[in-house]
């Protein structure tokens, strides 16, 4: 038995971790708010739940960071306030409170990345007060993880204040950066503000290749320096690479992973190029094939099974139909620099502007339009041509709410991903 497989019993026997989930699940079972009885009584329901949990965690590496357990950056660390919020929100009766929200707090960026999803969106930068109000609405809505992105979020002088606002209200704040502009004094201010995790973009172990892909000379050196500083400051430290076809076919992720390990990175993230932003009109050759996806999923599982560091987090594995699927608009939301509320940063469907209207009705509209439940497949990968047809006719990007709802209606619903199918019906869904 692998050593890290023994961690799960230790976690489940820790009352600091299980106290709130057990209390919430018992309360929900008594009130009948959720069909959770099969998970709380002996028999086949519990066995199915344990079987799926085992299959999921078999490909994950649970690690410790500053006294907390971390599965991966999709979930908050535990025990902790943000983790407890996941379960306490179930008691509120709110319709599918979002687990996470990513905020593009600026569109300003000194880089020109080949895959940028923000290109063609409106630019600008809202004042501090607007974002502080919005952070209050997000945490009232039940968000557990708040990610600050851009543009380059480090260009905002008030970033520590925004981080502190999220942390003080019980969320786990994360920062996504190129590393540009990060120095020791700023890192300390972010740490004091409550930043939990820091993710730095790093696409290649070859400096010239990384600089070329990011459109900025010195990008590699800035990224490496930021990763070292992140570890020294005590953040949960992640690197993130965008996987081109050549990245997979030539196994460039292997020397990049070795570099990340040498820098003390704790999580090695791999994201697919998406048909949006700069790539919205790209042909299929720019996107990964099913064979590429299978290769990255294999790397995720096999590397994590070995128990070394860093753990691998390939999005196309975590968000696969066999696990959690696509939670854009039902478990996750994205707000761009202009305030447009979208399912994720890759899906240019706006359901309202959070600087012009209250957030909760916008969230509910988006949640219902996206089908009320997580989808088995990535929405933008499946329906980018439909989105582009609407964008070409309307000349708007992201699409306004009325057109976004029409896109969702034409896209239709999908069966639940296997995890959620098990929760609601005690069995997996079809492909």
Regions found by a protein language model. Give the residues of each.
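Membrane-proximal basic amphipathic "stem/tether" segments
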Residues: 1-78, 403-431
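Hydrophobic faces of well-ordered beta-strands that scaffold small-molecule active sites
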Residues: 101-103, 146-148, 173-175, 198-200, ...
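Radical SAM enzyme [4Fe-4S]-AdoMet core and its adjacent flexible, acidic
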Residues: 1-30, 193, 203, 208, ...
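Conserved alpha-helical substructure of the radical SAM core
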Residues: 28, 41-68, 75-189, 193
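Short, small/polar residue-rich loop motifs at catalytic or cofactor-binding pockets
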Residues: 326-330
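Flexible mid-to-C-terminal extensions adjoining Fe-S/redox cofactors in radical SAM and related proteins
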Residues: 53-54, 346-431
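Local cysteine-cluster metal-coordination motifs and their immediate loop/turn environment
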Residues: 108-118, 343, 376-385
């Amino acid at each position: 038995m692998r050593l890290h497989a023994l961690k799960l019993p230790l976690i489940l026997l820790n009352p600091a971790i299980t106290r709130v989930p057990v209390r919430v699940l018992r309360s929900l079972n008594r009130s009948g708010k959720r069909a959770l009885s099969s998970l709380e009584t002996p028999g086949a329901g519990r066995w199915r739940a344990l079987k799926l949990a085992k299959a999921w965690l078999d490909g994950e590496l649970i690690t410790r960071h500053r006294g907390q357990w971390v599965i991966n950056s999709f979930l908050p660390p535990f025990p902790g306030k943000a983790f407890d919020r996941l379960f306490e929100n179930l008691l509120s009766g709110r319709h599918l409170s979002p687990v996470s929200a990513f905020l593009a707090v600026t569109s300003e960026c000194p880089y020109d990345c080949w895959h940028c999803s923000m290109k063609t969106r409106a630019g600008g930068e809202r004042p501090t007060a607007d974002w502080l109000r919005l952070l209050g609405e997000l945490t009232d809505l039940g968000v557990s993880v708040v990610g600050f992105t851009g543009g380059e979020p480090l260009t905002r002088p008030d970033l520590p204040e925004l981080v502190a606002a999220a942390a003080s209200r019980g969320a786990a704040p994360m920062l996504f950066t190129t590393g540009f502009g990060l120095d020791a004094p700023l890192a300390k201010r972010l740490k004091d503000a409550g930043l939990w995790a820091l993710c730095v973009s790093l696409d290649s172990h070859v400096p010239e290749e990384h600089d070329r892909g990011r459109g900025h000379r010195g990008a590699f050196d800035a990224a490496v320096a930021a990763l070292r500083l992140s570890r020294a400051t005590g953040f949960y430290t992640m690197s993130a690479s965008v996987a081109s076809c050549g990245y997979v076919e030539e196994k460039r992720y292997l020397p990049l992973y070795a570099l990340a390990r040498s820098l003390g990175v704790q999580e090695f993230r791999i994201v697919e190029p998406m048909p949006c932003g700069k790539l919205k009109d790209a042909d299929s050759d720019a996107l990964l094939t099913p064979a590429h996806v299978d290769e990255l999923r294999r790397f995720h599982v096999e590397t994590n099974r070995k128990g070394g560091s860093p753990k691998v987090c390939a999005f196309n594995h975590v968000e696969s139909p066999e696990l959690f699927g696509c939670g854009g608009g039902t478990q996750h939301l994205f707000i761009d620099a202009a305030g447009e509320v979208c399912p994720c940063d890759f899906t240019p469907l706006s359901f309202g502007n959070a600087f012009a209207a209250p957030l909760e009705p916008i969230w509910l509209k988006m949640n219902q339009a996206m089908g009320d439940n997580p989808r088995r497949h990535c929405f933008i990968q499946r329906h980018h041509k439909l989105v582009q047809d609407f964008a070409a006719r309307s000349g708007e990007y992201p699409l306004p709410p009325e057109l976004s709802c029409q896109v969702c209606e034409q896209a239709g619903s999908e069966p639940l991903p296997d995890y959620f199918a098990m929760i609601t019906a005690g069995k997996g869904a079809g492909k």
